[in-house]
UniProtKB/Swiss-Prot annotation:
Residues that bind Na(+): 78, 81
Function: Fluoride-specific ion channel. Important for reducing fluoride concentration in the cell, thus reducing its toxicity.
Entries under PANTHER family matching the protein: FLUORIDE EXPORT PROTEIN 1-RELATED
UniProt keyword annotations, A-Z: Cell membrane, Ion channel, Ion transport, Membrane, Metal-binding, Sodium, Transmembrane, Transmembrane helix, Transport
Short name of any one Pfam family annotated for the protein: CRCB
Activity regulation text: Na(+) is not transported, but it plays an essential structural role and its presence is essential for fluoride channel function.
Gene name of the record: fluC1
Compartment(s) of residence: Cell membrane
Superkingdom as given in the UniProt entry: Bacteria
GO terms (BP aspect): cellular detoxification of fluoride
Transmembrane stretches, start-end: 3-23, 35-55, 74-94, 102-122
The protein, known as: Fluoride-specific ion channel FluC 1
Similarity remark: Belongs to the fluoride channel Fluc/FEX (TC 1.A.43) family.
Length: 127
């Protein structure tokens, strides 16, 4: 049953990632760096932080048997965000020797995702 809950959340998260990515690519057809995946990962980090803040009111209090965590934390946000695509896009920038774009993309992705998670968590944990 737990696998089904994760799969449903993951399916919805993957579809949401695709839709946000497509929307971003239409709005920014020639971005300075991979902005669609950056936005997806920042939104996902904020969303996961808000999910923990609203649902658990403390960091990482979830259990692997908790249906909400299985669906939202592992399923939806696990599929919505993507470290593997971030890595591919970073390697493409390395291959193209786009050092400034690479540095900006990596810094914004890593620091931005952590900041977005904390903003989501602390912005909602007292509700």
């Amino acid at each position: 049953m737990n696998l089904l809950i994760v799969a449903i959340g993951g399916g919805i998260g993957a579809i949401a990632r695709y839709l946000v990515g497509q929307w971003m690519m239409k709005r920014f057809p020639d971005p300075p760096f991979p902005i669609a995946m950056l936005v997806v990962n920042l939104l996902g980090s904020f969303g996961l932080g808000a999910f923990f803040g609203l649902y658990y009111h403390e960091l990482f209090a979830a259990s692997y048997d908790d249906i909400g965590y299985l669906f939202g934390g592992i399923g939806f946000f696990g599929a919505f965000t993507t470290y593997s695509t971030f890595s591919v896009e970073a390697v493409l920038l390395i291959r193209e020797r786009e050092w400034k774009k690479l540095f900006s993309y990596v810094l914004l992705s890593i620091v931005g995702s952590i900041a977005a998670f904390l903003l989501g968590f602390y912005g909602t944990s007292s509700w």
